[in-house]
Amino acid sequence: MSGYYNRQYSHFHGNNDRYQTGRYAYQENGNRYKGFQRNGSGNRRYSREGFGSQLRNNENESRPIRSQSRGISEIPRNPFATRPVVSAKYDRDEFNTKYHYYDIVSKRLRNESSFKKWKSEKIPEHGYVTTTELIASDKQKPILMARQPEQTSVDPRIRPMNGDAVSGSISAKKRYRKLRSALVRNSRIPYDSFYIGPEPPKEIIVYPSASNQQPIAAALSEAIIKNYFKSFGEIAHFEQFMDPNSALPLYVYLIKFTGPVSQPDAPYKAAYKASEKFKDAPYTVSGIKFNVILNQNTVLNSIKDKLIKQNAARVTEVNKAKRAIAEKSSGQKPQVIRGVPYDLTQVVNNRPVLFVPAKITFYHRFNAADFRYQLRKYNWAKIIDHYTGVYIVFHDLENAKACLEYESGALVINSHRTHSPIQIEFTFIEPKRRLQSNITNQRDINKPRKIEYSSTEELLEASTKQILKDLHNIIKRDILRRLVGPIIFDTLNPANYPEVVERQKKLDDEKKKREESQKKTTIKAKPAEFDIFSLYGPASKTKKLKRDRKADLGKRHLYTEESPDHQRKKKPKVEHMSHLLNDEISTREDTVDSLNVGSNGENSPESSGYESEDIISDESKKQSSVITTPEEDLPESAASLPDERSKELLQYEGKYKPIASEFPTPVYPYDDFDLNKSKQLSLDKFQLALKDEEDFSILKGIVSEKSKDITTDYTPFLPYSMWKLYQQIEQNGIIRDNQIALNEKEFDSTLASTTGSFIADGFKKIPDKLKSSYLLHHRRLAQPLNTVHNHQEQNFMALNGTESTNQEADLEQDNHNASSRLNRVFQRRFQQDIEAQRAAIGFESDLLSLNQLTKRKKPVTFARSAIHNWGLYALEPIAAKEMIIEYVGESIRQPVAEMREKRYIKSGIGSSYLFRIDENTVIDATKRGGIARFINHCCEPSCTAKIIKVDGRKRIVIYALRDIGTNEELTYDYKFERETDEGERLPCLCGAPSCKGFLN
């Protein structure tokens, strides 16, 4: 090998010098190393052929040694025998012949001249790069392009500024790094016995968010918060904090979690989960938003202090506003407060009212709903939208004054006309200090007045005077009863005055004879006439039970003079109004029947509800005798009339004299005039109402009193005015007859135009009760309306009324009932076959599911209803207790139903199609349901709703309560709960005889 290297070294020497320094040299001259040698002086040295190295002590004694060729096989001497021969590992012939061998000495490739270049004409000189080319609207093709050496390289992952994709890039979109709002926290480390560091928090703080409306007026129960956070873990401690200044809740809650001993990480995990869940969105309950955080360090105290300071500042602002209002009101003149309109006095019932005038509500189109939402924090009773304005009625005076102080001038509502905020100012109408009723006043008057004494001596003196006064009254009464009374009675004894007694007896006998003779002559002249005290005939002879005699005493003396106190103490007969009306009708009918009973010998109905022992004997007497004055258990003074009264009765005409009948009858028959809404008689009916001179004289007196102040003389125009009125009455009668002939009913007078043009009147809402006068489907007739327009032969045949038609109809009804029963039998068999096939297949399938209710339903349809909007009608006769249709809809939970009901009310959907199955399930047919939802309410329904189970599921089914005819409307009772607020009640338009008037 060629080359050399020179290096000093040291080795151990035997003399005093421990180490001897030598020189190791190598030169690229082809000589080989011969090992360590000694010189002539005995010093050791290393040498090579052709180059010698001398030691320090004898450098001149070195002699050159020629190097031998590489091919000599002489093994070099190595005194240490540990250092290998220095040679190249790949310096061999088999490696030197290879092209890739690299000469480490010359630092070049061997045989470089025999190498070939790799460049070709197909490949660019400087290489190539890969890019893409657009071949379609959404497709790209990779291509090769020559690389330019002067072009700088670009990171293919970065999009350039011009927006074009770089060649070789992975994606054309620029990838942005996600923005961090905070440092990313490490994952939570579970807490156990090997946990290092402070204990993690296991308490959370629930406090109101700053976005809530202040102050928080909603009443929130602690149980709601506690029950909700119980879902995260077991709660060991729950605490609510109050404001120390006002003792009002701060709505700040401290919740501490716990867990079983086997799970030490459970409370910490529960607190962490609760805080993480509401980290971004607040916890909302009852309209109040709450933040949830972990209780760390002094967070709880800082939150409490902040809320207490806010409440104190709010109280300071309220007091300041109160003082400003007081100063303002003291400086202004007292405002004249108007009262409540007369038509609202009963509704308001002398309660405090806040009033907003109509000039504000009408112009900005405010209604009661706007104020109802804005004043929802206050305990108001009712909000009335009147034509004079809006009246807000409160239960008590405190809430009314609080609303006036805080909301008057501060309440802002957006105008529905200008869409700008309007400041509302209230006018306070204080309730009148009215006196109590007469009974209360009487009690207050009779109640002894409480007297206070300043000392004990005054009390003893007053007590002594009262005792002496009572003793004086007792002694006086005792003297009158024991001494004065017996002396007076003994003096006035009739035995002491026999002449006076005999004279009085004679006068009484003569008077009695005269009355009897007068009575007989009166009966012979007019056998059907007698005195006014005998109008009730033999019914008064009916004996009463002992318990009813006292109550009947007032009935016997019905026309006698009684004191007002006695009349006030008598209790009226308590009966339902419908029964009283029935009694009135029956009495009129029985009046005519009672006159025929005497001649025909039939039993007459008695006015009393009890039977007597001598009724049979009395009736036998009535059959054989002429009508006479019945005997009554009355004193003679009441049973007989004096001479003057008898002569006065004889002077009256026959029609004015009392008639012998069981019930009193009027002189003239009752004229039932058809009055309109104005309660005024027309001119012709008014003339018919004047029967005799007595009526005319009374009318003349009334008119003369009313016409005293009239100075104009209308006498010349009176004939023309009368003729014009008669012409108008006649024309109105012709119009009314034409309306009845065309529309089967007279138009309501309130529907007429007041200005002569309906366009000038503008739009107005017509009540459903008035629509029946001009809409056919709103008319309630005896027979069901054919609003479905089924052109069947049964309707035509039913109008003939022949016996054959009725028999055919009955036969058809029987056939229909039999066919419906057969249909149910076939459906049950079909259902059994399906169940058998399902069991044979071995799995459930919707193809084999059958709803039995759809097969059993009757043919019904919906059309315009006479009750309300749309109704459900039967297309064929339906027998009682038969299934009609299923109430189909969306099955939802109770909380969802409440939310939807509020949403429907806000959106303007007036009708409610929510039907409750049980406490947790409600059927909503508002947007997804069948035609069964069109069934209207009626107080006398023809159907009923039942909840049955079909294949294990609850269904709502409508059944018939009675036989239902063709084209008859189907109704059932909604059974709504009664509303306490009169303004929230819905009127019932069913038109049934027993209609309750309201749905709720």
From Swiss-Prot:
S-S bonds: none
Superkingdom as given in the UniProt entry: Eukaryota
GO aspect biological process, one term: methylation
Protein name stated in the entry: Histone-lysine N-methyltransferase, H3 lysine-4 specific
Binding annotation for S-adenosyl-L-methionine: 974
Post-SET domain span: 984-1000
Species of the source: Kluyveromyces lactis (strain ATCC 8585 / CBS 2359 / DSM 70799 / NBRC 1267 / NRRL Y-1140 / WM37)
Keyword terms, alphabetized: Chromatin regulator, Chromosome, Methyltransferase, Nucleus, S-adenosyl-L-methionine, Transferase
Domain comment quoted from the record: The RxxxRR motif forms an adapter helix that bridges the nucleosome and ubiquitin.
Assigned EC number: 2.1.1.354
